[in-house]
Regions:
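Conserved donor-binding/catalytic core segment of Leloir-type glycosyltransferases
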Residues: 5, 221-237, 242-246
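Membrane-proximal helix-turn-helix segments that form the acceptor-binding/catalytic region
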Residues: 87-91, 110, 114-118, 131-133, ...
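Nucleotide-activated donor-binding/catalytic signature segment of Leloir-type glycosyltransferases, i.e.
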Residues: 261, 267-298, 303
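A charged, aromatic-enriched C-terminal amphipathic alpha-helix characteristic of glycosyltransferases
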Residues: 356-364, 370-403
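Nucleotide-sugar-dependent
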Residues: 15, 237, 287-297, 304-326, ...
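A short helix/loop element that forms part of the nucleotide-sugar donor recognition site in Leloir-type
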Residues: 49-56, 204-220, 377-378
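Carbohydrate-associated surface elements
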Residues: 175, 197
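N-terminal subdomain of nucleotide-sugar transferases
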Residues: 1-59, 244-252, 402, 408, ...
Length: 413
């Protein structure tokens, strides 16, 4: 079994760490691998959930070296964090012999690449998408900004070195893998494809009674059509076509929109007005839920959306919410040009793929709502579980730890 140094700039006490990192670490430890974990924790989150993570790690024999995540001073804080990451990793390498450095995303991989020779370990670059291009396309590193341009060029150079120097690469999509195979920096390292998977034990299919109870809490009738949206409002997911679709469904069938997100009702309504698709408070229901509560709210939803702007970086996007919707038996509207979404929707028969996000596509989606809502949720869940169950991803990482020279793929090429 492998001895692994796992480095992530995300926090294990944050929602993403709880859902997308912690289960994999615990599963790998249960498979017999020995892990030392470096993560960056926000002080308030560490105070709330740190003891829970420590207890889980102690039970599984995982060593944890949490570091403080800094948010100020701007820009300088990130540099300080990177120095702290390098120091923590160097200290771990001095004290332990590792077979593998598992670096989650670019910042961690830069540290891993710098230390792999000293550690005598192989580097697993778990890239999580084309991060520099996501930052530029999302408006964080604008091309017209001197600082933005410098940061983009620096991290694209880091990216090339990471692709060239890693011993194993994990991508979220086959689309990203096929793209990397064409890069001059690619030197033949095995590339595994492990999409964002869902915890099908947590995201369970609701009973008819549970669905009725949740709708009562929302003050909605059992037969009211509900269009769902899961996740915070950000730069990746497109709200304009979602609002436009909701308005059409409202006008044709009295549908309501359910938003399970961090934003308030007023923020959702303000965003709808800004996008030229105004809604009234009666058109929507907005709930803020902890992760364990999300499945019960999804139990009220008939069909949900997963609309993302297609760009270069979207080749590497694997929406976590896709598997979570399907685990709850909820079919999905999605648009073409996003990672392996088109392939997965076809294999799972999990909803409707729109060619684009224009008005004609939104009209087509509205016309198909009743048909999608009538699909058998149990059959949908079963088909999706065979492809996107969390256990399959945990097993895939364990197989890489067992033999880093062999690629693993959960999505067919």
């Amino acid at each position: 079994m492998a001895s692994v140094l796992y480095i992530t700039y995300d926090g294990l006490t944050d929602p993403i760490g709880q859902s997308q990192i912690l289960p994999y670490l615990l599963g790998s430890a249960e498979a017999g691998h020995r892990l030392t974990v470096i993560s960056f924790e926000k002080p308030q989150r560490l105070a709330l959930a740190g003891d829970q993570v420590r207890a889980q790690f102690a039970e599984h024999g995982i060593a944890w070296l949490p570091q403080q995540f800094r948010s100020s001073p701007p820009y300088l804080a990130k540099a300080i964090d990177m120095v702290a990451m390098r120091r923590a990793a160097a200290g771990a390498v001095r004290n332990h012999k590792f077979d593998l450095i598992h670096a989650r995303s670019y910042q961690a991989a830069v540290t891993g690449l710098a230390l792999k020779r000293k550690a005598g370990a192989k580097l697993l670059f778990d890239m999580r998408g084309f991060w520099p291009d996501q930052r530029r396309e999302g408006g964080r590193w604008r091309s017209r900004s001197l600082l933005g341009s410098q940061l983009y060029r620096r991290w694209k150079a880091h990216e090339a070195r990471l692709i060239a120097g890693s011993d194993h690469i994990v991508a979220l999509t086959q689309a990203a893998r096929q793209e990397m195979l064409t890069w001059p920096s690619y030197r033949g390292a095995p590339i595994s494809v492990i999409p964002c998977c869902a915890d099908f034990d947590l995201f369970a299919l609701p009973s008819a009674e549970a669905r009725r109870v949740v709708r009562q809490r929302l003050e909605l009738q059992d037969d009211t059509p509900i269009l769902g949206y899961l996740g915070s409002i950000g730069t990746v997911y497109r709200l304009a076509p979602h609002f436009a679709l909701l308005r059409r469904l409202r006008d044709s069938s009295g549908a309501k929109g359910l938003f399970v997100c961090r934003e308030s009702e007023s923020e959702i309504l303000d965003e709808a007005r800004k996008l030229g698709t105004p809604l009234s408070p009666d058109d929507i229901r907005v709930v803020r839920a902890e992760r364990a509560e999300v499945p019960s709210w999804l139990g009220a939803v008939d069909v949900a959306t997963c609309f993302i702007t297609p760009t270069f970086s979207s080749l590497g996007v694997s929406p976590t919410k896709l598997g979570e919707y399907w685990a709850c038996g909820v079919p999905v509207y999605a648009n073409a040009g996003i990672g392996d979404v088109a392939q997965l929707i076809g294999e799972v028969d999990g909803g409707q793929l729109l060619p684009d996000l224009g008005d004609a596509s939104v009209d087509l989606a509205a016309a198909q709502f009743a048909t999608l809502a009538a699909r058998d949720p149990t059959a949908l869940r079963d088909r999706a579980r065979a492809r996107l169950d969390l256990g399959r991803a945990i097993d895939a990482y364990a197989r890489i730890y067992d033999d880093w020279q062999q690629p693993v793929s959960l999505v067919a090429a």
